[in-house]
């Protein structure tokens, strides 16, 4: 697998211009301790100057360095209230992160950004 070697997958152009937005939430599952290749490509291809990014990720118990990698890719952005959302380690859909914690995170974003 090329994920652990920094592979960036070609992606189709977005149908929206992120320059029209001040705040952008970007999420990804964890693959080989980092973000998915498509998300990595997206983050590296955009101009993040003056943008507020809300990074979040999902994982099965091994968060790796996803958030750190996302921040590194979004050069010149500022960041608000990152979040790791954990599911069970067997690859299932059982949420480990308490639902209330996720709801509080969303409320914090709504109260402080919008």
Q: Where are the model-predicted features located?
A:
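FMN-binding flavodoxin-like domain, especially the glycine-rich phosphate-binding loop
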Residues: 1-114
């Amino acid at each position: 697998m090329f994920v652990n070697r920094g592979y960036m997958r070609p992606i189709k152009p977005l149908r929206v211009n992120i320059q029209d937005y001040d705040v952008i939430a970007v999420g990804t599952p964890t693959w080989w301790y980092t973000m998915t290749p498509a998300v990595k490509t997206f983050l590296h291809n955009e101009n993040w100057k003056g943008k507020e990014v809300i990074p979040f990720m999902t994982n099965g118990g091994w968060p790796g360095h996803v958030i750190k990698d996302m921040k590194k890719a979004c050069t010149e952005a500022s960041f608000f209230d990152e979040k790791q959302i954990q599911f069970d380690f067997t690859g299932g859909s059982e949420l480990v992160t308490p639902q209330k914690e996720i709801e509080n995170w969303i409320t914090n974003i709504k109260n402080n950004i919008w």
